[in-house]
């Protein structure tokens, strides 16, 4: 009940004034963002011009990469996708945003990914990032890669054994020449790449390919990424803390993953005390900055290790599953890749790093085209213009505003990749090998950025190619493979991904027939 001195009419009048002020403020806010903003001249979705929550919504749905591609199809090469975000879908723009020496730094959005300490992926300051990258690169040198090969080969052997099993709960092996039951390759690729990264980084003895103890960890990463992807597009701030009410399952998954990382680091430190620690963790623990002679702190060491596990599991797993998907849906491509591998190697023992693997150029083209159509991180990597602003493909980006290129959109650009939704490995074999209808004035690498480019490009890119090439060589040599009986090949289909920082996926279901090989 209102006090007698505050009558109903006065209350309604005050409420009307208050509402009028709110409406006026909102109108001014909208007018400023739509007509008096440095990005006002650029087309884009209306809600995107007004609020970041347009991007948050599509991040939550997992279709932000598709939506950005559609926006570029509708509006052209320059799209205002957020109030302060300009998406640039040109080969020149890609180079000018991300290459060395550009006046950009990582967006503050990346703060949403920081948990305990900033790592190489999330560090915004260029000088600090340079220090971290110099340290991390010591675990990703050519010599380090050679030392990891034995571990990778062991994991590939375990994967091939798993593909021969009748089912996951028995040791019954499918006889040579017989087709086995369908395998969900999104799961097996996740477990395989997760095992590789944990073994390469920490030298752990267990295997998700043979045991179920840690098989939920890749799923925890996927669930956790839904929340973080939304926080990134919201602007990178976690100060409001409303995410704990919106994403309780994602936070629980994050906490479980952090516990896993802490446990495995403790195992690594225990092995270190015994002098038996191997892998990248040992190299990172002992590494010092060549310029400052400073090592990584313990928190930094934990952060870098966790990031390597996450990035190395998700991205390589998606590329491997996508390659298998496209091979199974394109019989002529499959036959050519099989012929190349089986004519190159006379035994499984010959499949290793060196000239023979490097000579499998068609298989490499299959991998490249698979990553073009279904990139592991298909979204935009936002960059913020530094002091003085920057010019990108003729467009001025004022200081503090952001620009980026959506990986999925640029890798489906019809001028760079004619008939961009067609799976054509020949695009990567040189101009003379490309059928006329798929030829372009651009190099296929002009828009190819599954690992990003420039000083922030993925440091694990060579390791990913090693895993992908060796694994596919072994699978194509040791097995025939096909889609399950009753499932028709579809050469026009694309391996579908959901974007939550990296790509979430399902399938393909594939049947394997072991060959009698040495």
From Swiss-Prot:
Phenotype upon loss of function: Abolishes the production of aspercryptin.
InterPro entries named among the record's database cross-references: Cyt_P450, Cyt_P450_CS, Cyt_P450_E_grp-I, Cyt_P450_sf, Cytochrome_P450_monoxygenase
Transmembrane segments: 11-31
Positions of glycan attachment: 184
Name of this protein: Cytochrome P450 monooxygenase atnE
Similarity field: Belongs to the cytochrome P450 family.
Organism: Emericella nidulans (strain FGSC A4 / ATCC 38163 / CBS 112.46 / NRRL 194 / M139)
Record-linked CDD domains: CYP67-like
Pathway(s) per entry: Secondary metabolite biosynthesis
Subcellular location, record wording: Membrane
Enzyme class, broadest EC rank: oxidoreductase
Keyword Metal-binding: yes
Cofactor: heme
């Amino acid at each position: 009940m209102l006090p007698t001195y505050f009558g109903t009419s006065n209350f309604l009048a005050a409420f009307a004034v208050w509402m009028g002020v709110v409406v006026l403020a909102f109108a001014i806010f909208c007018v400023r963002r739509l007509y008096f903003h440095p990005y006002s001249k650029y087309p884009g979705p209306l809600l995107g011009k007004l609020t970041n929550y347009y991007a948050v919504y599509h991040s939550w749905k997992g279709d932000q990469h598709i939506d950005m591609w559609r926006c570029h199809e509708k509006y052209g090469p320059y799209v205002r996708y957020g109030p302060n975000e300009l998406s640039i879908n040109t080969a020149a723009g890609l180079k000018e945003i991300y290459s060395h020496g550009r006046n950009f730094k990582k967006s503050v959005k990346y703060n949403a990914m920081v948990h305990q300490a900033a790592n190489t992926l999330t560090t915004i300051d260029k000088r600090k990032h340079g220090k971290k990258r110099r340290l991390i690169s010591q675990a990703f040198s050519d010599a380090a890669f050679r030392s990891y090969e034995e571990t990778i080969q062991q994991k590939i052997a375990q994967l091939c054994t798993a593909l021969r099993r009748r089912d996951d709960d028995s040791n019954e092996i499918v006889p040579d020449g017989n087709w086995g039951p369908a395998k969900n390759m999104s799961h097996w690729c996740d477990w395989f790449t997760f095992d590789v990264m944990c073994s390469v980084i920490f030298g752990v003895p267990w295997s998700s390919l043979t045991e179920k103890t840690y098989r939920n960890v890749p799923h925890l990463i996927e669930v956790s990424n839904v929340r973080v992807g939304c926080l990134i597009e919201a602007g990178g701030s976690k100060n409001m803390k409303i995410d704990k009410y919106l994403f309780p399952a994602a936070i629980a998954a994050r906490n479980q993953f952090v516990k896993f990382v802490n446990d495995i680091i403790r195992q690594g430190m225990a092995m270190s005390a015994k002098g038996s620690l191997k892998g990248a963790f040992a190299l990172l623990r002992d590494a010092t900055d060549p310029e400052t002679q400073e090592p990584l702190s313990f928190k930094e060491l934990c952060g870098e290790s966790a990031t390597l596990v996450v990035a190395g599991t998700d991205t390589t797993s998606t590329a491997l599953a996508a390659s298998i998907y496209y091979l199974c849906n394109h019989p002529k491509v499959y036959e050519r890749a099989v012929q190349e591998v089986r004519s190159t190697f006379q035994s499984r023992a010959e499949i290793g790093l060196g000239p023979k693997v490097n000579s499998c150029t068609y298989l490499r083209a299959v991998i490249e085209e698979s990553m073009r159509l279904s990139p592991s991180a298909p979204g935009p990597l936002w960059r913020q213009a530094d002091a003085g602003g920057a010019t990108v493909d003729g467009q001025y980006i004022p200081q503090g505003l952001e620009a980026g290129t959506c990986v999925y959109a640029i890798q489906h650009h019809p001028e760079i990749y004619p008939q961009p939704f067609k799976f054509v490995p020949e695009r990567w074999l040189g101009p003379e090998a490309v059928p006329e209808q798929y030829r372009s004035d651009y190099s296929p690498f002009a828009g190819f950025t599954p690992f990003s480019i420039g000083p922030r490009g993925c440091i694990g890119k060579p390791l990913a190619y090693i895993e992908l090439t060796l694994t596919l060589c072994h699978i194509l040599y040791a097995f025939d493979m096909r889609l399950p009986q009753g499932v028709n090949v579809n050469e026009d289909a694309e391996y579908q991904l959901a974007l939550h920082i990296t790509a979430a996926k399902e399938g393909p279901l594939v049947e394997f027939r072991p060959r009698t090989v040495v």
